[in-house]
Amino acid sequence: MTYFVVFLGLCFVLGGLAVASNPSPYYGVVGLVLASVVGCGWLLSLGVSFVSLVLFMVYLGGMLVVFVYSVSLAADPFPEAWGDWGVVGYGASFVVVLMVGGVIGGFVGGWDFGVVTVDSVGVFSARLDFSGVAMFYSCGVGMFLVAGWGLVLTLFVVLELVRGLSRGAIRAV
């Protein structure tokens, strides 16, 4: 299990590197999807299954909007790929920065943290995840409404930007 969590952590870092060193919007969206799927898998391995599922569904919807927006506005006839030398050098510089940060963080002692997700007292075992479900639907109603309104507003902004010159969402390239 430890190897799996370390593998998910490395994939999350690679997804972040793919977003940071994206040569084209197509590849940036792939990096975002990779990072979100691996992050939700990481939460799932820690035992927070409901929050992981909710975040995965929200990220999947968000990535769909980002993908449509970036593909509609990308006008590169020959986009660069991840194998081009400029992109490889850019990604390698990010890896060096992450390694130096990891070494400095290891010397300072920034790795002393722990995550506990299951409380067990005797026979009873109450998962912290299910108390989060109750908080989502009781105290978080206002935040859900604000987040929903923000997503609807973002959808209208993206549709207006993609619309072009009064020709609707489909336009000739």
Swiss-Prot record:
Its main location: mitochondrion. Belongs to the complex I subunit 6 family. It is a multi-pass membrane protein. GO terms for cellular component: mitochondrial membrane. It catalyses: a ubiquinone + NADH + 5 H(+)(in) = a ubiquinol + NAD(+) + 4 H(+)(out). The gene is MT-ND6. This is NADH-ubiquinone oxidoreductase chain 6. It is found in: Mitochondrion membrane. GO terms for molecular function: NADH dehydrogenase (ubiquinone) activity. InterPro entries: ComplexI_Subunit6, NADH_UbQ/plastoQ_OxRdtase_su6, Nuo/plastoQ_OxRdtase_6_NuoJ. The chain crosses the membrane at residues 1-21, 27-47, 48-68, 87-107, 139-159. Its EC number is 7.1.1.2. It comes from Cepphus columba. Core subunit of the mitochondrial membrane respiratory chain NADH dehydrogenase (Complex I) that is believed to belong to the minimal assembly required for catalysis. Complex I functions in the transfer of electrons from NADH to the respiratory chain. The immediate electron acceptor for the enzyme is believed to be ubiquinone. Keywords: Electron transport, Membrane, Mitochondrion, NAD, Respiratory chain, Translocase, Transmembrane, Transmembrane helix, Transport, Ubiquinone.
